[in-house]
């Protein structure tokens, strides 16, 4: 059921973004009196699920959910309609319009996607505001993934600054270390200040981080599996584990370190229940689990809720949109640095779908839709033939040089671009499949 909800959110989100992206091309084409022959959500290779012709335009839904398109008269695009291009240009065709008009038509989808992202972020701030745990309330420091521990960080460290920039939100630490390729991490450890120097060439390892870090918390039971080993041992909700086989335990990560990879093994656990300390014996199962879920940081630290008026939400939403855009451009840049091996983390529809929550949450849905809208805008403006950016590149050449590239050249460029895009699509989704088997 979780997978179905994720797929549904992905399809709804992409459908919204694709329709509005193509609408950007469509509206500008009609403004400049260019005929649009087709307007499709998803591709209709061979057949369509639905179609209806209104005026000069056929509107439809294809069966292949890899995108969508508008077929603009007199334009060399993925339809590769050579017969139409052999005929004399007509006043209603794309090729008969001025270069600046054609440029605006090609930029229409990208502009709509970017403005849509800003609009969504504004509405998210207005509707839900922000809720977060201030860094000064995270009193026990953080628990780190192994790749960060390998840098010299220790569980319990409080991260104060990255490359001299004070940390404002703990959720951004993981992102900033990786994307900004942080060189110096300032931490507080046992009351002392330390600088952790990040060696060069760590990006490829850090890109493999899943959660990076989370606030460190005591090991308290939040849920017990019915008939699980911990429940059978007599444990209760809200019990705090403070010792394992005589070794004191202050935090959940310490409990995991003492019991991990031990299958079908009994442990003597010291448990704090209210003001009483109890001793219980609990065993791991064949998977090395006790059958309980721990409390998380939100159970220990009070959050701050910030509400925005509509006027206040406008700059907040715009800033969020530009921040996300800048971050994604930095991540995209990593793909062209072989030493980072960022290409190994490239994912397709499975990876995109996995970022949606397993339950339908409108705030997270709209945040993810805005994020994907920015990705769609950036990817489409890349100067690759067959993408909007490829057409923009050739139009800018025409405007600057005064010479229009020949139709044959544009046809060949379109073919090369389509092959490149299909190869990237295949590679990204193959990465997803390989990742599923690895997991």
Regions found by a protein language model. Give the residues of each.
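Residue-level signature of transmembrane alpha-helical entry/exit and packing/kink sites
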Residues: 2, 6-10, 97-106, 110, ...
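Small-residue-rich helix-interface/hinge motifs
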Residues: 2-85, 379-401
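Alpha-helical transmembrane segments of multi-pass membrane proteins
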Residues: 14-18, 71, 113, 372-381, ...
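Short beta-alpha junctions and helix-cap segments that line functional grooves
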Residues: 50, 107, 170-174, 198, ...
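Internal alpha-helical transmembrane segments
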Residues: 68, 72-143, 423
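Juxtamembrane extramembrane loops of integral membrane proteins
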Residues: 75-82, 92, 97, 142-201, ...
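Functional transmembrane alpha-helices
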Residues: 88-97, 210-243, 247-378, 393-416, ...
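PDZ/PDZ-like domain segments forming the peptide/carboxylate-binding groove
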Residues: 124-168, 205-243, 247-251
């Amino acid at each position: 059921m979780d997978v179905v909800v994720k797929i549904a959110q992905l399809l709804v989100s992409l459908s919204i973004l694709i329709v509005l992206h193509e609408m950007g091309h469509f509206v500008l084409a009609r403004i400049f009196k260019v005929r649009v022959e087709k307007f499709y959500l998803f591709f209709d290779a061979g057949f369509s699920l639905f179609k209806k012709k209104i005026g000069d335009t056929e509107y439809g839904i294809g069966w292949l959910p890899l995108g969508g398109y508008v077929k603009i008269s007199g334009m060399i695009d993925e339809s590769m309609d050579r017969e139409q291009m052999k005929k004399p240009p007509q006043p209603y065709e794309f090729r008969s319009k001025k270069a600046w008009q054609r440029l605006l038509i090609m930029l229409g989808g990208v502009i709509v996607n970017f403005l849509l992202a800003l609009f969504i972020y504004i509405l998210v701030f207005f509707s839900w505001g922000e809720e977060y745990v201030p860094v000064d309330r995270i009193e026990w420091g953080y628990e780190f993934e192994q790749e960060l521990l390998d840098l010299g960080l220790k569980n319990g460290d409080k991260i104060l600054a990255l490359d001299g920039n004070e940390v404002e939100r703990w959720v951004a630490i993981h992102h900033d270390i990786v994307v900004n390729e942080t060189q110096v991490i300032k931490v507080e450890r046992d009351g002392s200040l330390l600088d952790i120097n990040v060696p060069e060439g760590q990006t490829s390892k850090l890109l493999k981080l899943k959660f990076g870090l989370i606030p460190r918390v005591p090991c308290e039971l939040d849920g017990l599996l019915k008939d699980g080993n911990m429940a059978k041992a007599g444990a209760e909700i809200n019990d705090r584990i403070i010792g394992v086989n005589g070794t004191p335990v202050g935090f959940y990560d310490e409990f995991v370190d003492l019991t991990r990879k031990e299958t079908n093994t009994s442990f003597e656990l010291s448990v704090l229940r209210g003001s009483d300390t109890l001793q219980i014996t609990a065993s791991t199962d064949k998977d090395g689990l006790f059958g309980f879920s721990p409390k998380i940081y939100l159970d220990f630290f009070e959050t701050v809720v910030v509400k925005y008026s509509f006027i206040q939400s406008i700059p907040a939403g715009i800033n969020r949109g530009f921040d996300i855009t800048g971050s994604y451009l930095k991540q995209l840049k990593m793909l062209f640095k072989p030493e980072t091996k960022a290409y190994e983390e490239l994912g397709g529809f499975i990876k995109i779908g996995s970022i949606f929550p397993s339950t339908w949450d409108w705030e997270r849905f709209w945040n993810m839709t805005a994020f994907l809208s920015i990705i769609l805008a950036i990817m489409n403006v890349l100067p690759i033939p067959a993408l909007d950016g490829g057409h923009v590149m050739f139009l800018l050449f025409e405007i600057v040089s005064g010479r229009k590239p020949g139709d044959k050249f544009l046809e060949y460029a379109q073919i090369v671009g389509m092959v490149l895009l299909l190869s990237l699509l295949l590679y990204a989704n193959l990465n997803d499949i390989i990742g599923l088997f690895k997991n």
